[in-house]
Each structure stands twice: as C-alpha cells, then as structure tokens.
Amino acid sequence: MAQNSKYEAAKIEKKWQEIWHKNGEFEPKDDYTLPKKYILSMFPYPSGRIHMGHVRNYSIGDALARYYRKNCFNVLHPIGFDSFGMPAENAAIKHKIHPKKWTYENIDYMKKELSSLGFSFSDRRMLATSDPLYTKWEQSFFIKMFEKGLVYRKSAIVNWCEHDQTVLANEQVEDGCCWRCGNEVVQREFPGYYFKITQYAEELLNDLKTLEGKWPNQVIAMQENWIGKSSGLEFKFYLDDASSRALGGKFDGFEVFTTRPDTIYGVSYVALAPEHKVVRALLSSEILDDTKKAKIKSILNQSPRERQASDKDGVFLDIYMLHPLTNEPVPVWVANFILADYGSGAIMAVPAHDQRDYEFASKFGLPIKQVVMPKEGKFDTSKANAEYGISINSPLINGLETKQAKQAIIEKFEKDGLGKRITNYKLRDWGISRQRYWGAPIPIVHCPNCGVVPENEQNLPIALPDDVVITGEGNPLDKHPTWKYTKCPKCGHDAVRETDTMDTFVESSWYFARFASDEKTWQQTAFDKKSVDYWMSVDQYIGGIEHAILHLLYARFFQKVLRDLGYLRDDEPFSNLLTQGMVLKDGKKMSKSKGNVVDPDDIINRYGADTARLFILFAAPPQKELEWNDSAVEGAYRFLNRLWDKAKTIKKSEILPAIEHANLNKDEKYARMKVYEALKKSNEVFNETFAFNTLIAACMEALNALNAQDNDDVNTEGFFIILNLLEPIVPHIANELSEELFRRKNFTKLEILEEVFVKDTINLAVTVNGKKRAEFEISADASEADVLQTAKASVAKWIEGKEIIKEIYIKGKLVNLVVKG
C-alpha cells in the first residue's frame, strides 16, 4: 500500500457500492438447507429525504446483516417503502403534483441516499406498498377475510380528523390528536369497514408470553394494557316503571359491566357515556329540559382529549334504575369520563371505592357509601379506597375478603339469572376505512340488488385512477366521474364501487412476509410457501418504540390471520425486537420546526458514510437516546484515518500468520490479547447485547496495543482481525483495506485462540495483619514457596523484627501475613 496514499472516503465508498450491487453480494441464497438470519428494519415512508433516525435504524440492521453473512448464515436483509398515505395528497395540494409522481420521485431519491450509506439491502426484493401488484394481494386478503367474517361494515361513532378529512383508529389518536398531523380529533358517526381484531384478543394477549426476554418489557406491557383484558360481572340494571314509561317503553334497562361486583351494595348512581343509546333517546324526548340537553350536547361535541382534560362533569337524566339486590332507586347520570366503547358504555358508580366515581359524586353531592373495609382497618374519607379488603354494609357478603366476595356475588347473579361472568377487552375492532385517494381501494361493490358484494378476485387489483383532482376537500374517489361506476360481480347489475381506501397500517401489517417470499413468484402468488416457511419469522426486527401499539399490534394480528388463511406457518412475525432510541440535538428530537436537523447528506459529503455509521453506532447503545455531537463525528473520522495509516505498515497476507505465543515479549502478548478480546466482544455484541459502542471501543484499544509493539506477524494478525470486526460497521474502508492487504479473505468466521488469554505473570497483593502493604508481579506458575518468599521481601519493613505467626496464600489473589511483636 502506497505510503503517500490518503483516505478518500467518497472515492472508496462509490467504488465499493458499485461492486456490491454489480455482484449481487447482498442477495439471499436459494439454498434453504443453510442456517438463516432474517434481519429487518422498519421500512420508511418516502417523504423525500432520509433523516438521522433512519440512519441509526438501518446502521444497526446493516451491521447485524453483515456480521451474519460472514459468519456463514444465509441472510435476508430487505428494504421497501411504505408508500401510501396522506402526506402525498397534502403534497399534491401544496405543490400541484400528482401523489403518485411525488411518491415515486421520492422513492428514487431515497434509494440513492440509502445506497450512499452502503446499506446491504437486497435489490431484488425491494418493493413499494403502492405498487399495483402489492395492492392486488392486499385486496385478495381483504376478500378472504370478508368471506371468513373477519371484515364487516357498520356505522359507528368514529375518530374524525377534520384536517385530514379521514377516520382514525383508536390507536392513531394520541392525546386526543391525529397521530399524523397533530390536529385535534372529534367524534362523528360514520359508516366504515372493520377488521375483527377482537376475535384474536385472547391469543394476542397470551402469545406475548412467548416474546418475553425477546421483546422489550415496555413494549409487552404497552400491548397488554392496550388489549386491556378484564374479567367481571355483566348484569342488567332495570328502569323503574316511571322512567320506562317516560321513555315510551323503548327501554326496560341496559347492561352494565363491573370488575368489582363485591362493591355492588355501594352503588349510589349509574353513569352513562354521552353517546349511550338511552342518552340519545332522552335528547329527542320531552323528559329533559333545554338546559340539560344543551349541556349534554356540549359534552358530545368535546373531543376525547378535552373530556380527559376537563373536570368531572355531567347531567342528571331525570330517570332511575332499580338496584338489582335491594330494589332501591338509583339515579342515572350522563358523565363526561365514561367511554362509549368500553364495556357497554355504562357503569355502576361506587364513589367510596373508585376515584373517578368519587370525584363526580363529591362534585354533585351524591352519597358515598363504604362497603369495603381496608386491611389496615380505617378509612381515608378524603379519597376513594380502591384496595381489596373485607366486605361491610353488604348483607350477602359481609365479612368476606374481596376475592371471595366477588365470586359470591357473581354466583348469586348467575344462579338467579340476573347476570353472567364475562371477560372484556379495551381493544376495539380496527376501523380501516379512510376517505382519501392515495391508498389501497377497498375491493367492495355496492349493488342495489345484492347489497355489499366483494369484488371477483380475477378483477384484482382494483387500481386507482390517475386522472384525479386533489383539493383537500372530501374524497377524490367519490367525486371521480367514472371510476366508481361498475357492474355487480354477483348479478351483473349496475353498481357502485366502495370509494374508501384502506388504512395505510394495513400495508405495513404484512410486508415482512412479502419480503420473505421469493421475488420470482410475486406475480403468481402472495407468498411462495417454501420460501416463506424458510425465512419466517423475522429473526431480528428493529424500529422505534412509538410503534408498540400501532404497527406492532396490527402486524401480530395479520400474522395470525394469514396463518389461519393458510398462507403462513408461524404464530408471531418477529422473534426478536430491538427498539432504538431517538437521535437528539441540543437535548431535543431532531425536527425541521426546531431547526436542529442534521442532514445525513451533509455528513456523507464532508466525512463519508463510514464516519456517519461509526459515530451513530459508537455514540450510544442502540436502545438509548443518541445526542448528536459534532466533535464526536470528527473523532470518528480521525479514527478511520488512523486505521488507514496503520494499513500502510501491514504486510500482505491471505491467511493468518502462525505465531508462537510463548516466544513473544510482553507488549506483543498484550496486543494479541486485546485483539482477541475484541473478537470475543464482537460475538457478545452481535449475538446478545447489541452494544456496538463497546465493540468499537475494544477495536480502538486493540489498535492502540498494536501500535505499541512492532512485531510484523502480530500486526498482520491483529489488523486481519480488526478489519473483520469493523466491516459490519464501516464496510467501505474495511473492504478497501482488506482487498489491498488480504484479498478480502479475512471476511469469514474467526476462531478465538484461548492461549492469548493465559497470562505469564500475575499481580498479587500482600497484606500484613489484614492491611494492604504491597503488591508484586510474579510468574503465573511460580511455586507457593517462591510466592511467599517474594511477598515477604516486598513488605520487609512492615515485618522486620516481628514474629510471623501465619502465612496465608490465596492463589492468584493475595498473600496475608499475620505477625506479632
């Protein structure tokens, strides 16, 4: 290697990127007998530019993929683009450009950016979810799910984003705002299609146990809470005669669900959600005065965020229920804190033992009756006591502990036919209808004769029309002059297409399985079974924790649905999950609005992709937040220059030199030990901890140790190994130097030599009467007599003139001398 050569990152990186892609070095092999690793980072939305969060995500995945390739695994490491979605329509309005053109121009640009970072993605399996072929199979799944009863249509109160003019699933509402645009969400009644995810609620919950130790505990807990399983008693509260008559006999009562049936004697009111059917009936009746109706309507008009932020509020509805055990009248209120979509939208309120009920009762002067004695035997009347204890003031269950009391009440209700034991879930079916253009059309036809009819599969894909006008007002497909008009696939009569498109989370709920299918079969089938059975499930999935109850839950649901439809084999899509932390600058998440964005292109142009990758993986463990640091980027660049300069001193070799370790001097032995320590660290990092920063630090220490000695063979061996260890992290410079020195023969599985960890000498402490007085170095195989003699010599001034009563040698650690006098 020329002594005057300089590290030219741009030249080297362009060269190797062309070689890798020309040779197809990142394509998975078709040999399904090989051990495999499927490494997948969450694919990006094609917004136009990648950001540092992408760089971090894909640097982690790429390091893993490269490590496993050179360690004899067949590796699938694909990338694609989650390319449907609202931003394309917003761009169409703002820039007067078609969403399709905007999207695919962005994809082309982002592909170049990803390539410029040297990521080892499969070219042949790259896809965009807006491709018609992808839409075809997604529509096919929809039809099969419809036929299996896993899709249904209904009108319901939905989350509506006024800004994006579309419906949102519960999971897409964050603190009362749209997850995408951040604007407030309101409630509207709207017809739409729903995936029956609740049919899989129990399995989704139970299978989380199989992910323990493989997924972050926080993600598992978030999904458990979102699914929200609770068991209790469902029973009917009956209206008293006067209230029933006032409602015109339309209702005799309604169902209530409680997880604390033991507190039933403490009920002082019943609370309904503002959307409850009884409340709606009262709004159109003469029972309530105009003031009460106006207040209820004001609550209805509040967004979920406003209701949660508000003080407890409500309206007495001028009707009463009858207590199922005492037959006493119980007032019925509408309350702003009751959710319409949990249980039946009605609760029995027990103020003494539920804090929300307590706050409401305190505000409106409703009775607060204690029916559970705390275990410590005294009440705190300033708040609700929700703890378990002993039932009191409850004739049927006085003296029973809470668990026994709950069981006794449930048995009483079931025996008398008053109610039943049920399990409820907070999880709600997934509303997938979106009133936008740039999405996968729902393959349904509305026929005046046949009703709702799924499209014939041979007509798929139902493609989007190109000749649309995006104004931001209403649904472009519904306004299209011809696209929606068709023939009924069942009777041939004139019919109308469904003009809603699918939630874009549908696309990201199965893309991982599409990647796992041999791309040569993509035209003929959704999944090639042989290929999918080999590659699935994903061995390592990488992405942000913000997807814990959106994408990750939906993907698990889709995996189970596709399994039950016969497409897939596994119960879970992702065997292991790594959630990387955010990239911060000045302590805040990078964003254009904060003016603290670092453009990856700027870093690549100035320092090179390897510097960017090295900094990203060295600055912090992947699970932690990463604080951008310009001086640390400079430091990463300096290290790569040191690596380049070291290469000028290395002799060319295609094999590791044979070294007699025993014949080496102290510095040479130390250098070999540091190199093999780094090799050990590499195996630990890639297979267990993902703490790439510790591996990089170990390589830096090893390079320093090599520089501190001048044995050519030790240098050659050490550099041979260090380039191997760094290749997954800084692949361009590692390949360039390896080709020059070792013809890339070092990029293979390396064995650890245990002999280098055997120390020739050991350090021993010497204590006199328990106090440390000295430390000395001695041959590791020295006899005990030699050890004791040397120890006594090292503390001569502490034992001079004194009698040694006892000599204690703890091998390899210390010598303790007990003296007197």
From Swiss-Prot:
User: Which keywords does this Swiss-Prot/TrEMBL entry list?
Assistant: Aminoacyl-tRNA synthetase, ATP-binding, Cytoplasm, Ligase, Nucleotide-binding, Protein biosynthesis
**What GO CC annotations are associated with the protein?**
cytosol
Kindly state which reaction or reactions the protein catalyses. tRNA(Leu) + L-leucine + ATP = L-leucyl-tRNA(Leu) + AMP + diphosphate
Question: What stretch of residues is annotated with the motif 'HIGH' region?
Answer: 44-54
Indicate whether Ligase appears among the record's keywords: yes
- Report any one BP term from Gene Ontology: leucyl-tRNA aminoacylation
Q: Where in the cell is it found?
A: Cytoplasm
Which residues bind ATP per the record?
Answer: K592
Q: Name one GO molecular function term.
A: leucine-tRNA ligase activity
Name the family: Belongs to the class-I aminoacyl-tRNA synthetase family.
Q: Which HAMAP family match?
A: Leu_tRNA_synth_B
* Protein name per the record: Leucine--tRNA ligase
UniProt source species: Campylobacter curvus (strain 525.92)
